[in-house]
Amino acid sequence: MAAQVTDALKNLKVKDPNAVVESAAEAKANGNAQPEAEAEDSDDDDEEPVNGEGAGEGGAKKKRKRKKKPKKKAGANPKVQSSPPRVLLSNLFPSGEYPVGEEVEYRDENNYRTTSEEKRYLDRMNNDFLQEYRQGAEIHRQVRQYAKANIKPGQTLTEIAEGIEDSVRALTGHPGLEEGDNIKGGVAFPTGVNLDHIAAHYSPNAGNKTVLAYENVMKVDFGVHINGRIVDSAFTIAFDPMYDNLLEAVKQATNTGIKEAGIDARLGEIGEHIQETMESYEVEIKGQTYQVKPIRNLNGHDILQWKIHGGKSVPIVKSNDQTKMEEGEVFAIETFGSTGNGYVRDDLECSHYAKVADAPNVPLRIASAGKLLNVINKNFGTLPFCRRYLDRLGQDKYLLGLNALVSHGIVQDYPPLVDKKGSYTAQFEHTIVLRPNCKEVISRGDDY
C-alpha cells in the first residue's frame, strides 16, 4: 500500500530546515498547543485556513467553517419499485392517492339514473373504498410485472407461487404471521399455478416438486386485498407460440365481458357475447386444429368485502339468467377457454379451502378441529387459504382436523378443476367496479 498523508503532517509548519520541531509536551509548556477539538477533523465540519492581514510567520491563522452537508439516509423515500418487489407501496405513493384503473363509459344511456353532479358526489363519498381497491390493484400490477418477466421453464411451481405471495405481503406491509394481520391486508387467496388441462384451484402443497416446462400452458391466478377489498386478476403464460391463438381468444373474450358489463346489464346476455367471441377463434396445436371452447361450468362472480364469491355468477356461455348487475357492485370478469371438452370436474389433491360465511355451530369431537378453526378465524376469516399458509403459521398435524371441518360444513374445500387430460386451457380475468358515472377496470394494466 502507498503511504497516506495524514492531517497531522499537513498542519505541521517547518520554519527552517535546520530548526528543531517542538514536541507536543514542549508546545504545551510554551503555550503553542492547539485545542484538541481543532486539531482533529470532524465528519461534519471541514476547516480551511485563511490568511489574515496581520498574520505573520508565527501568527495564528483564522479559520472558516464549511457548512454541514446533509447526510442522505439509505433507502429514504424510494421512487421506484425494487426487483423483486419489496418496497411498501404506500412509500411510493405517500399522498395515499393510487392510480385510477381504466375508466369506461357505460354504453346504455338508460344506465344513468342520476345527474352528473350527483354521480360525482357519490364517487367522492366512495373515495376510501376506491383507494383501497386501487392500492390493491397497483400492487397486483407491480407484482405480476415482475412475475411475468421472471417466470421461466425449470422453476418449481412452489417457487413461483411463493415468490408472488412474498411480493404481495411485502408491498401491502402485511407479512401475515401475526394473529389477524392477514385479515387487514395481503394475500387474498392461494396463488393458482394451473398447468395445461388444470383450469383452476391448483396451488402446490408442501413437498410438491412439479417443475414448469417450456411446453406447458400455465394460468397464474392471484389476489391482493386491502381491508377485505379483493382484487382478483389472472393471466396465462405460454412459452411456445403455437398456443398464441388460445391465449388471444380468452383474452378477447374477457375484454368482451368487460365491454358488456354495466349497471342493469343482464348476466345471461353477457355470457352470450363472451361465448361468441371465444368460439370465433381456432388454434392449431401439434398439427391438429381446435375450436376454442368456453368452459361452460366456470364463471365470473361478484366480490364482497372479505368474500371472494359474493353470490352472483357471470356465465361465459349463453344462459337465461336475467339477474342484473347493480350500481356499486364489484365483479371479477373471468373467462376460460379449452381445447378439450369445455367442461371441468374435481380432481387431484386439494389445496384450497375457505371458511363458510354462515357456517353451522356444531360440536367438534376432534380436538384438533376446534384448535384449527380458531386459527382460521383469527388469520383468514372468510378469505380462502391453503395448506402452505397453515404450515407457515406453524400448524402441523392438522389434516384430520381440517377434514373434520370440511365434513361438518364449516370449511369448504375447493379441489383443482380439470378438463380432459391432454387438453390445454387458458384464463384471463379482471376486477371491475360499477361506479355511478362509469365502470372502472381496477386491475387493468399495460400487459392485459
Swiss-Prot record:
The EC number(s) this enzyme carries: 3.4.11.18
Localization (cell) = Cytoplasm
For region Disordered, the annotated ranges are: 1-94
Which species expresses this protein natively?
Botryotinia fuckeliana (strain B05.10)
* Molecular-function GO terms, alphabetical: initiator methionyl aminopeptidase activity; metal ion binding; metalloaminopeptidase activity
What GO biological process terms does the UniProt entry carry, in alphabetical order? proteolysis
Task: List the keywords (alphabetical).
Answer: Aminopeptidase, Cytoplasm, Hydrolase, Metal-binding, Protease
Tell me the residue numbers annotated for binding substrate: 201, 309
Please give the name of this protein: Methionine aminopeptidase 2
Enzyme class, top EC level, equals hydrolase
Top-level taxon: Eukaryota
The protein's matches in PANTHER family, at most eight in alphabetical order, are given as: METHIONINE AMINOPEPTIDASE 2
Return the GO cellular component terms, semicolon-separated.
cytoplasm
**Job description of the protein:** Cotranslationally removes the N-terminal methionine from nascent proteins. The N-terminal methionine is often cleaved when the second residue in the primary sequence is small and uncharged (Met-Ala-, Cys, Gly, Pro, Ser, Thr, or Val).
The entry's free-text remark on the cofactor is: Binds 2 divalent metal cations per subunit. Has a high-affinity and a low affinity metal-binding site. The true nature of the physiological cofactor is under debate. The enzyme is active with cobalt, zinc, manganese or divalent iron ions. Most likely, methionine aminopeptidases function as mononuclear Fe(2+)-metalloproteases under physiological conditions, and the catalytically relevant metal-binding site has been assigned to the histidine-containing high-affinity site.
Mark out the compositionally biased spans (Basic residues). Answer: 61-74
